[in-house]
């Protein structure tokens, strides 16, 4: 009985550690998309499917004026 309780306790601790590590890994991979993928020309970025996606260039109006 003690052996099965010990095994169950170790299993629960390991599963909690793996779950925590997975969350941290996902946060680091996607965290700070605004800084990573849009250093100078984007308004914002989002994490979509584990990748940073940039959109909404802030310098678009300036480029349009130069084009005309």
UniProtKB/Swiss-Prot annotation:
Q: Which residues form the propeptide?
A: 56-68
GO CC annotations?
Answer: extracellular region
Entry's localization field? Secreted
Provide the tissue specificity. Answer: Expressed by the venom gland.
Which keywords does UniProt give here? Disulfide bond, Ion channel impairing toxin, Knottin, Neurotoxin, Potassium channel impairing toxin, Secreted, Signal, Toxin, Voltage-gated potassium channel impairing toxin
The cross-references to PROSITE patterns, in alphabetical order and at most eight, read: SCORP_SHORT_TOXIN
Please name the GO terms that the record assigns under molecular function: potassium channel regulator activity; toxin activity
Could you tell me which InterPro entries the record lists for this protein? Scorpion_toxin-like_sf (IPR036574)
Secretion signal, residue range per the UniProt entry? 1-26
All disulfide bonds of the chain are 30-38, 33-54, 37-47, 42-52
Q: Does the keyword Disulfide bond apply?
A: yes
Tell me its family: Belongs to the short scorpion toxin superfamily. Potassium channel inhibitor family. Epsilon-KTx 01 subfamily.
What does the function comment of this entry state?
Probable weak potassium channel blocker.
Free-text comment about domains: The presence of a 'disulfide through disulfide knot' structurally defines this protein as a knottin.
Output this protein's name.
Answer: Peptide TsPep3
């Amino acid at each position: 009985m003690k052996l099965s309780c010990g095994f169950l306790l170790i299993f629960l601790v390991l599963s909690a550690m793996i779950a925590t590590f997975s969350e941290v890994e996902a946060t680091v991979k996607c965290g700070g998309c605004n800084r990573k993928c849009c250093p100078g020309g984007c308004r914002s970025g989002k994490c979509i499917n584990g990748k940073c996606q940039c959109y909404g260039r802030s310098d678009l109006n300036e480029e349009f004026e130069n084009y005309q």
